Amino acid sequence: VLVFYWVLKTVVLGPILKLLFRPWVEGEENIPDEGAAIFASNHLSFSDSIFLPLMVPRRMTFLAKSDYFTGRGPKGRLTAAFFKGVGQLPVDRSGGRAGEAALRSGLRVLRRGELLGIYPEGTRSPDGRLYRGRTGVARMALEGGVKVMPVAMIGTDKAQPTGKKIPKLMRIGVKIGKPLDFSRYEGMEDDRFVLRSITDEIMYELMLLSGQEYVDMYATSMKDRILAAAKTKARELQEAALPGTAAKELEDALDASDDAPPRRRGTSVDDAAADIDEDTAAEDGPADSAASESADGDASASGRRAAS
């Protein structure tokens, strides 16, 4: 596995990607020459997990969702072989015991003195903004006794938006901030308020590095809202297409057109999504402590906003 990783990075895939995308790095001097560390990055695109390890001289391991390792057919087997070959670890995101297993997998990487990549948001941003971090990254940093390197991926969402299989040829950037030391909280990894405070500090640094707008709600909650809006719109369109259902509405609109001002057009799915900007952290509610231990940080507790 280790040999395959270095062959891909330095001989096969790495040189081709560097030639095509001409990636740039800012803050390379902050990368530790030795010892374990967590690289906590924003998450804009699938290609983040390719370009970040490519631009870091040392080997980096990411905790990848288990779906990548269980696909069927030629494509599924090829995907699983690739992720195993580059040293990625499968993670079950269902929470509970699965979250605990993910935490232990990450800690094993750190205790070997290696670099571990984590996306505190837990999923890709649905709209390019930075979302509230999950506290698993904080717990892993405290239990592993390691520093956290804030990382901002630049332009990967434009090169490979969600749903696009082949990335657009354009320059990709990686910004690596100064290491964050949380040793002052040693022994407090079970304090949910400490975990929230650490996570918010990490997200604040990511906001400064990336220049992204910060939204104090979970990215998964935003995705749920966008999906719900899309389903509602689809139902409305389906109902409007039924025979006879639109006729009476049209007659009413024509009758009222002389007396009433023009009606506002229906809200599109994109409009509905754009309207969801308010602070909704309270709606997420405190998560249970078991879920807080997942590799993507599948837990949280109510706490300070990252920008506070």
What is each stretch, according to the model?
Residues V11, P23-E28, S47-S49, G76, ...:
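A generic local structural motif
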Residues F21, A36, Q88, L115, ...:
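Generic structural signal for secondary-structure transition and capping sites
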